[in-house]
UniProtKB/Swiss-Prot annotation:
Subunit composition and interactions: Part of the 50S ribosomal subunit.
Biological process, per Gene Ontology: translation
Chain residue ranges for the region called Disordered: 47-72
GO cellular component: ribonucleoprotein complex; ribosome
Keywords: Ribonucleoprotein, Ribosomal protein, RNA-binding, rRNA-binding
Protein name, entry field: Large ribosomal subunit protein uL4
Biased composition (Basic residues): 59-72
GO molecular function, one term: rRNA binding
Family per similarity comment: Belongs to the universal ribosomal protein uL4 family.
Record's function text: One of the primary rRNA binding proteins, this protein initially binds near the 5'-end of the 23S rRNA. It is important during the early stages of 50S assembly. It makes multiple contacts with different domains of the 23S rRNA in the assembled 50S subunit and ribosome.
Annotated organism of origin: Borreliella burgdorferi (strain ZS7) (Borrelia burgdorferi)
One Pfam family it belongs to: Ribosomal_L4
């Protein structure tokens, strides 16, 4: 699949080949869902904790005798029914992370790349560039040629360019990711996806193995 390549000024300068085995496969929505669920689960800290009736502070003495008072029978004021009592079936610290099969993860990445590549308006390929000044305004001027800032924007790099990443730190809703450190959730929810030529070439090689 051929796609137009633009200069950083927004002018068309050529074309690039998007490998059909990566950018034009039958989309597996199930694998995308499972990958996003896995990524978000792995981010959870899992530190929520409540006290049971055995852990909450207070006496275990029976508040009143079992019979003869006319009131409901109670064994302890730490009863979950009472205010200040323990919590029944409340959360405890746990690890929410789990591993996703490699084949499912790989299929999810290729599916989401194919989904994004199908829309030429939100997926742009531009020439390789660097922001030597490391200044936010210089990067913002380039991005404005391809995307508006009223939604999430993701830039895909072919290498770990620290100057571009530095320039993008102060731009809201912008994520700058290396081709080998992508997340399906970022690609799926981005309003605009900007890929450098080097990133496309690396993705072509990386996901056809």
């Amino acid at each position: 699949m051929e796609r137009k390549v633009f200069s950083k000024d927004g002018k068309e300068i050529g074309t690039i080949n998007l490998d059909d085995r990566v950018f034009n496969i039958e989309i597996s929505h199930g694998s995308i869902y499972n990958a996003i669920k896995n990524e978000l689960s792995n981010l959870r800290v899992g530190t929520s904790s409540t006290k049971t009736r055995s852990e909450v502070r207070g006496s275990s003495k029976k508040p009143w005798k079992q019979k003869g008072t006319g009131r409901a029978r109670v064994g302890t004021k730490r009863n979950p029914v009472w205010i200040g009592g323990g919590i029944a079936l409340g959360p405890k610290p746990r690890d929410y992370s789990y591993r996703l099969p490699k084949k499912v993860k790989k299929l999810a990445f290729k599916s989401v790349l194919s989904l994004r590549a199908a829309d030429e308006n939100s997926f742009k390929v531009i020439e390789n560039f660097s922001v030597e000044s490391g200044k936010t305004k210089d990067l913002a001027l380039i991005i404005k040629n391809f995307a508006s800032f009223n939604g999430k924007v993701v830039i895909l790099l072919g290498n770990d360019d620290q100057m571009i990443k530095r320039a993008g730190k102060n731009i809201r809703d912008l994520k700058i990711l290396s081709f080998d450190k992508l997340r399906v959730v970022d690609l799926f929810y981005a309003k605009n996806l900007i890929a450098l030529e080097s990133a496309v070439n690396k993705l072509n090689e990386f996901y056809i193995k």
